Amino acid sequence: MAFKSTRQEAIFGAVLKNLGELGYKDELLQKDYAFVDWFQPNNPVRTIPAAAFSQTPHSYDSACIAVVLSNGKCGRPLIVENRALGAPYAFEVTEKEVVHWRVGKDQESSRELLRISPDQIARTFEENRSRWAAPDVLRSKSIGFKLGPRQLDFIDLGLIPALERQISTKLDRILREVIQNATNSHRRLDLQSLYHLIFRILAGKVLHDRAISPFADFTSRDQGKILQEVARYYGEQQPAIVDDETRGLVFSAIWQQLDFRNLSVEVLAYIYENTLVDPETRRDLGTHSTPHAIARYVVHHIPFERLEESQRTIIEPFCGHGIFLVAALQRLRQLLDPKMDAVKRHEYFVRMLHGFELDRFAIEVAKLCLMLADFPNHNGWKLTPEDVFRSPTFIPTVRSCNVVLSNPPFADFTTKDRPRYEGLKSFRKPAEFLNRVLDYLPQNGMLGLRMPVNS
């Protein structure tokens, strides 16, 4: 980064020092942080002098505060240029002072909040600790946390939805073009095999952009190595599609057009639910998507604090890509000692979280989502590829868990399917699921469900 003067450099240093006093230390405070500007047509990569995050992995979801330098561009245009970081607050460092901004989804909703002279930086940061500290900013960004009128003056709740719309629209367009082009060049293409190939390449690109070894050193020319490493990483077989033309087409599009730096875990969930699951599969499984805002809302209202740390065991039946498991992991992380060793924290998450899902492809997606949520750990997740209504291990797992989170299938058991299931009390899947859970959930167990009204 380039400073106009030693005075501006000193003010910048003072801002970072006081961000550290608010808890933004080590990995939570990044200098020269690069992120993709999804608001712009060509998705340029921007680099910001400093960015403060509430937790790792770094993403627009966990971004809290942007620190920018007033060098050439300044004021509102500078703030809006960096809004794709996802931070609701920004500090603009000039040669004279620090300007505190609310970052909005556009020029109109971004506005100056406060001017801070250099000799007042420490005092002002301490006075605003309750608004600027990481836990408070994270809560303010979350749906389900009620903001008062004064807080709404400082936070633009439209920023993240606007950013997510841009990201999802562009990702969906790019991937649908990839699918269409691959289908045109390979007339007898099996779509499920193509979807698996696309997701493996996406996984490789995510790991590359997150600088995970050995993916960080790969390029689009290392197609075979990338697929082999992804398969090894997840303990899965390679995709069925191996012809050079199809593989090269998909690699070229994804590697050149997509950049997963600063993207949230929920982006992969969106890709899976909206692009890589065909309507027939969705209909056969009776599945329906769970918006991540709903999952977070449900998890936010589960009183985990009432349980001992070792008793916060969670099961997500019909977990799909693990939307509730990811939300629960993020909530459990907030309740843990922030000084806990990363390896021990991962082992704790693995002990606490359990998922059941019939669709093996969905489990593969869930593994990647959980890995990104607990970045960069990837081993040991307890995701069982079984039908909840026929699984010999489901009831014992329910008995061992104190929290059930789920969005069960809304469909009925068909006349053809009913003989396959023993002891059905209801032909409605939501009702049957609820019966089984209530029969075996431990006393004082907790439920967080998304259910149809007429189940």
Which positions does each model-derived feature cover?
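Intrinsically disordered, charged low-complexity linkers and terminal tails
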Residues: 1-2, 298
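Short secondary-structure junctions and interdomain/linker hinges
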Residues: 174, 178-189, 205, 209, ...
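Short, solvent-exposed secondary-structure capping/transition elements
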Residues: 188-192, 207-218, 284, 307-311
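Short, basic/polar, glycine-containing "phosphate-handling" surface segments that engage DNA
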Residues: 2-204, 249-269
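SAM-dependent methyltransferase catalytic region
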Residues: 273-455
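Long recognition/docking surfaces used for binding and targeting
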Residues: 211-278
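Coupling/switch/interface segments within P-loop NTPase motor domains and analogous charged loops
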Residues: 200, 204-214, 219-220, 225, ...
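Short, solvent-exposed loop/edge-beta patches enriched in aromatic
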Residues: 57-61, 83-86, 209, 306, ...
